[in-house]
Amino acid sequence: MSDKYIGDSHLEETGEEKQDSQEKEAVTPEKAEEQKLKAKYPNLGQKPGGSDFLMKRLQKGQKYFDSGDYNMAKAKMKNKQLPCAGPDKNLVTGDHIPTPQDLPQRKSSLVTSKLAGHVEDLHQV
């Protein structure tokens, strides 16, 4: 029985070796391509932050893509500076069901509707 176990383990090792060699062959073209690119662009991976010029520009402060970005940032700054008003106690927020007494009085319009004058004409027909 021990002979079979040794034989099986030997076969497993051989299978693993075959898989390892296949993985190495699959990675080899990628590594070769990577080496070609490194030879073509030697300074590519040295500084993760970029050039000194770029770092200096980033240190100066935020720059905007166009006037729209600038105006939006400016509006955000104004909104932060405004004092926050407390919640209005008379504001209906959906906590209760409004009744006709809770609703404000409706304002009468100064201009009468053209449709309202014709209602009388319809009743006469």
From Swiss-Prot:
It is found in: Cytoplasm. It holds the Pfam family Endosulfine. Phosphorylation at Ser-67 by gwl during mitosis is essential for interaction with ppp2r2d (PR55-delta) and subsequent inactivation of PP2A. The modification Phosphoserine is found at residues 67, 109. The keyword Phosphoprotein applies. It comes from the Eukaryota. Protein phosphatase inhibitor that specifically inhibits protein phosphatase 2A (PP2A) during mitosis. When phosphorylated at Ser-67 during mitosis, specifically interacts with ppp2r2d (PR55-delta) and inhibits its activity, leading to inactivation of PP2A, an essential condition to keep cyclin-B1-CDK1 activity high during M phase. This is Alpha-endosulfine. It comes from Xenopus tropicalis (Western clawed frog). The lineage of its organism: Eukaryota, Metazoa, Chordata, Craniata, Vertebrata. The gene is ensa.
